[in-house]
Amino acid sequence: MEQLQAVIEDAFERRAEITPRNVEANLKESVAQVINMLDTGKLRVAEKINDEWVTRQWVKKAVLLSFRMEDNYFIKGGFSNYFDKIPSKFADYSSRDFRDGGFRVVPPAAVRKGAFIANNVVLMPSYVNIGAYVDEGTMVDTWATVGSCAQVGKNVHLSGGVGIGGVLEPVQASPTIIEDNCFIGARSEIVEGVIVGENSVISMGVYIGQSTRIYNRETGEVTYGRIPSGSVVVSGSLPADNGRYSLYCAVIVKQVDAKTRSKTGINELLRGI
């Protein structure tokens, strides 16, 4: 793995010179190896180690290099034709491959090669970009988007129209992460490397980026970039210092433990807030 990383790191420093016409065979093979490992889940862009998320920047660099190395080409599809650099994850899948994968794909869902889809995942007509990781038992509902390198945990529900942001550039940024057992309400957007802690519920129409104020109603604390585990979050606003206007924020209205979360329906958690 260290040798693979060294090849990628070296090539990335001279990425502006790389074209589909001059790419070295060794680099092309190395990048293809990384993409294949991402595709099968043997390698992840980010992983939780000792309760902290660690991002492998060199893996993101390999994904970016893949765009430099390939020309767009004609891609046949069941409903249309396409013109892109990256093939569909399922371009060469047989019926047996789908059965072995253990997930459902409802047309016209689209998944790029280099994204991992785990057992018991359901993909409604949705989009999953390269480098993403969608773990077991997750539902990606209609018109939801899982962006490049985003990490989605086990038993997550991404409701209709949800956007989970991708972060390939700037390359030093961490990916957006939705931890296990989270519910993300319809049309909500979680972007820019925000982390949503496990067992959290995000209500419909909540938008959270790195500059979004996250207000804890119980403590009065304002934080950025991370939703604590077990949070129930709705959209709200906070007044300006001069009292003349209010600006958008996300409000943590309550926090529940995993036991309460498992026994309580989503609507019950959001009522009476």
From Swiss-Prot:
Gene3D superfamilies: Hexapeptide repeat proteins (2.160.10.10), Tetrahydrodipicolinate-N-succinyltransferase, N-terminal domain (1.10.166.10). Belongs to the transferase hexapeptide repeat family. Substrate binds at residues 104, 141. Disulfide bonds: none annotated. Homotrimer. Its EC number is 2.3.1.117. Keywords: Acyltransferase, Amino-acid biosynthesis, Cytoplasm, Diaminopimelate biosynthesis, Lysine biosynthesis, Repeat, Transferase. It holds the Pfam family Hexapep_2. It is an enzyme of class 2 (transferase). One of its GO terms (cellular component) is cytoplasm. Pathway: Amino-acid biosynthesis; L-lysine biosynthesis via DAP pathway; LL-2,6-diaminopimelate from (S)-tetrahydrodipicolinate (succinylase route): step 1/3. GO terms for biological process: diaminopimelate biosynthetic process; lysine biosynthetic process via diaminopimelate. The gene is dapD. It is found in: Cytoplasm. NCBIfam families: dapD, PRK11830.1. HAMAP family: DapD (MF_00811). CDD domains: LbH_THP_succinylT. This is 2,3,4,5-tetrahydropyridine-2,6-dicarboxylate N-succinyltransferase. PROSITE patterns: HEXAPEP_TRANSFERASES (PS00101). One of its GO terms (molecular function) is nucleotidyltransferase activity. It catalyses: (S)-2,3,4,5-tetrahydrodipicolinate + succinyl-CoA + H2O = (S)-2-succinylamino-6-oxoheptanedioate + CoA.
